[in-house]
Regions:
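Bacterial N-terminal signal peptides
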Residues: 11-20
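A structural boundary/capping signal
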Residues: 2, 24-204
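Bacterial N-terminal signal peptides that target proteins for export
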Residues: 2-11
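General helical structural elements
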Residues: 10-12, 123-124
């Protein structure tokens, strides 16, 4: 009887630990994943970044389904997103380098794409595949261009954004999604076919 009671207490304790983490992963919706199209133009900043860091851009990856996001993986996404957002101070490329479109791994300051690059590197170091860590170009509601990191998962595409400490499914943002890195080649970019659908869905 005492053993059974202890086992029951242990089960309740484990559920108390695991349940909030598991429940935090958003449930799939109609706009779970982006629909990508053909190969499109590579941002000039990424082109120049690839010339300096060829190893990050010459990986050709086998086409495969997006992996299932585990509670541990979900916790890592949230941790790294908020950690990088807190450690790096946002500044424009013009203010940092005196010119636009300089993509780099930031140390103290960086533009939006620099935040995305650092999150990509840190998640890859934790075991995420580069095929699922895709820098993405979007348009903000005010028309300004912006860059975020998209993470492909079986449960859908999630966005890590330097303007938001909350990791969200892409369809819960107010952005128009334009293009992103190809999952099959880290140096190629593909268009996003349903990038405007998410804006319509967010306004409903």
């Amino acid at each position: 009887m005492q053993y059974t009671l202890k086992a029951r207490h242990l089960a309740v304790f484990l559920l108390a630990i695991l349940a909030p983490t598991t429940a935090a992963i958003p449930a799939p919706q109609a706009l779970t994943s982006m629909v990508t199209g053909s190969v499109t133009s590579q941002p000039i900043g990424h082109y120049e970044f690839c010339r300096a860091f060829r190893a990050e851009c010459n990986q050709r990856l086998a086409s495969r389904p997006a992996p299932k996001l585990t509670p541990h993986g979900w916790a890592l996404l949230k941790k790294i997103n908020s950690s990088v957002n807190g450690r790096i101070h946002a500044m424009t490329d013009k203010d940092i380098y005196g010119r636009e479109e300089v993509w780099a791994h930031p140390k103290d300051v960086g533009d939006c794409e620099d935040f995305a690059l650092l999150k990509r590197r840190e998640l890859a170091a934790k075991g995420f595949s580069l095929a699922d860590l895709l820098i993405t170009v979007v348009r903000k509601p005010d028309g300004e261009g912006h860059a975020v990191l998209t993470v492909r998962t079986e449960q859908g595409d999630f966005v890590l954004d330097n303007l938001d400490n909350v990791v969200k499914p892409w369809y819960q943002t107010s952005y128009t999604f334009l293009k992103r890195q190809a999952s099959f080649n880290t140096g190629r970019w593909v268009s996003i076919e349903n990038g405007r659908d998410v804006v319509v869905g967010a306004l409903r």
